[in-house]
Amino acid sequence: MKFAVIGNPISHSLSPVMHRANFNSLGLDDTYEALNIPIEDFHLIKEIISKKELDGFNITIPHKERIIPYLDHVDEQAINAGAVNTVLIKDGKWIGYNTDGIGYVKGLHSVYPDLENAYILILGAGGASKGIAYELAKFVKPKLTVANRTMARFESWNLNINQISLADAEKYLAEFDIVINTTPAGMAGNNESIINLKHLSPNTLMSDIVYIPYKTPILEEAERKGNHIYNGLDMFVYQGAESFKIWTNKDADINSMKTAVLQQLKGE
């Protein structure tokens, strides 16, 4: 079977390394490549994919929303998130999914077993935040709290959550067991501070969905304060494993995928 990841730029993507490691571990001769498709060429997506004879593909920045009009069906989780990161091509039909939310939550559950009873604060109200919130809301008992700079961002949400400003989030930080940053603050080249951690409880798990850099500024600050931290590496691996399951109906080798990504990160 043939797969790919599509984005612009895409040369930095670790998806090919991760998926190929999984194929090798499982003894599969499947292929996975990176395809750079600029925004101005995106209208040719059907033609490009058809020529490549792909069975499915991942889609990343800046095309996660742009792909939706080209799909024959969109899964509920992708509709909720307002973005697609996985496409299955079956019987000529394109079916869109979003595995980011379930990928993050599966990883988080592995390091925080009592997740269903946790009081959780999510920073940011974009697509990634929404996907994670919808997944958490399926089983977490306390009502989720989501903080954003502007309240207008919540107009597209139809989830029963506490909506607060970032300023209020700073005041009430001590009340949360887990704080999850889903904003771009802290990504490579972005040292913007999203929130002041002065009131962070020492028992709170601080998380960020970014894994490059391995420790974002907010994670470094929390670690200096003595908090446990959790980055986005597992989210990346588990979302990839979920994509593989959608394409092949097989379980991925999580360990081989994570090892391959870690080796690549250490080599950079």
UniProtKB/Swiss-Prot annotation:
Positions of shikimate binding: 13-15, 60, 85, 100, 211
Keywords per UniProt: Amino-acid biosynthesis, Aromatic amino acid biosynthesis, NADP, Oxidoreductase
Residues the record lists as binding NADP(+): 76, 124-128, 148-153, 209, 232
EC number of the protein: 1.1.1.25
BP-aspect Gene Ontology terms: amino acid biosynthetic process; aromatic amino acid family biosynthetic process; chorismate biosynthetic process; shikimate metabolic process
Assigned GO CC terms: cytosol
UniProt-recorded name of the protein: Shikimate dehydrogenase (NADP(+))
Natural source organism: Staphylococcus aureus (strain MRSA252)
Gene that this polypeptide is encoded by: aroE
